[in-house]
């Protein structure tokens, strides 16, 4: 059986940025990693209804900065910023350092892999037919400018006795092209028959030149003039 590498992991540093950017000494590394995990876990639970796309964590000078990418910023911020202040206090308590929270709005949720996967999962939990949910997600993504999209659901589809997988694809999804901007995400729907897994791949186009560090290395070096050896004419 052909095994597939994680589409986001293989593109890190090429066309995909990291979700956590910080440096730590050996003794602090495990604590920071554990703090990151607990912060993500807390925010995912608290903002379950806020259409959460991704959480980016930075740690500048003994503090923590969390950027929440969401399609519904109003739900996260709350009235006069009350909710975001509660989140800031909770994150500071979990991490043990002063916290700052930034909100970034996702303009096109139909082109965000995580939001599409969560949307399909929530529809399956509401007993919507899985083929209808898949086709609707694919059509919306293509209508808003995606170059290609693939959706796969697996489990006891439609309450069947034997679990199976079904997928639907439209357009191109070139997983082997490293410069391809592919947004991959997973989600799970907890139904009365069991858990149904959802996977989404969205191809948004190719990023030429890669990330800034890659472009600097790719610049051609000017040829140095060769020195003539002594005694030769």
UniProtKB/Swiss-Prot annotation:
> GO CC terms for this protein?
cytosolic small ribosomal subunit
Q: Which GO terms describe its biological process?
A: translation
Question: So which residues are the signal peptide here?
Answer: none
Where does the KH type-2 domain start and stop, copy by copy?
Answer: 39-107
Q: State the UniProt keywords alphabetically.
A: Ribonucleoprotein, Ribosomal protein, RNA-binding, rRNA-binding
GO molecular-function term, one example from the UniProt record: mRNA binding
User: What InterPro entries has UniProt attached to this entry?
Assistant: KH_dom (IPR004087), KH_dom-like_a/b (IPR015946), KH_dom_type_2 (IPR004044), KH_sf_prok-type (IPR009019), Ribosomal_S3_C_sf (IPR036419), Ribosomal_uS3_bac-typ (IPR005704), Ribosomal_uS3_C (IPR001351), Ribosomal_uS3_CS (IPR018280)
Quaternary structure, per UniProt, is: Part of the 30S ribosomal subunit. Forms a tight complex with proteins S10 and S14.
The family note in this entry says: Belongs to the universal ribosomal protein uS3 family.
UniProt xrefs under HAMAP family? Ribosomal_uS3_B (MF_01309_B)
Outline what the protein does.
Answer: Binds the lower part of the 30S subunit head. Binds mRNA in the 70S ribosome, positioning it for translation.
Full protein name: Small ribosomal subunit protein uS3
Q: What organism, scientifically named, is this protein from?
A: Vibrio cholerae serotype O1 (strain ATCC 39315 / El Tor Inaba N16961)
């Amino acid at each position: 059986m052909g095994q597939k590498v994680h589409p986001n992991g293989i593109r890190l540093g090429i066309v995909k940025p990291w979700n956590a950017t910080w440096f730590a000494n050996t003794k602090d590394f495990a604590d920071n990693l554990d703090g990151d995990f607990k912060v993500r876990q807390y925010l995912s639970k608290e903002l379950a209804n806020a259409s959460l796309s991704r959480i980016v964590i930075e740690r500048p000078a003994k503090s923590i900065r969390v950027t929440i990418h969401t399609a519904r910023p109003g739900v996260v911020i709350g009235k006069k910023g009350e909710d975001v202040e509660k989140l800031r206090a909770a994150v500071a308590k979990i991490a043990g350092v002063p916290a700052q929270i930034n909100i970034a709005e996702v303009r096109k949720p139909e082109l965000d892999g995580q939001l599409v996967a969560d949307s399909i999962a929530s529809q399956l939990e509401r007993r919507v037919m899985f083929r209808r949910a898949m086709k609707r997600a694919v059509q919306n993504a293509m209508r808003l400018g995606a170059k290609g999209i693939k959706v796969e659901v697996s489990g006891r589809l439609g309450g069947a006795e034997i679990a199976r997988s079904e997928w639907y694809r439209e357009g191109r999804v070139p997983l082997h092209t490293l410069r391809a901007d592919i947004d991959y995400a997973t989600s799970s729907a907890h139904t009365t028959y069991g858990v149904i897994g959802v996977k989404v791949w969205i191809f948004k186009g190719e990023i030429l030149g890669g990330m800034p560090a890659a472009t600097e290395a790719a610049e051609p070096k000017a040829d140095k003039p060769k020195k003539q050896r002594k005694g030769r004419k």
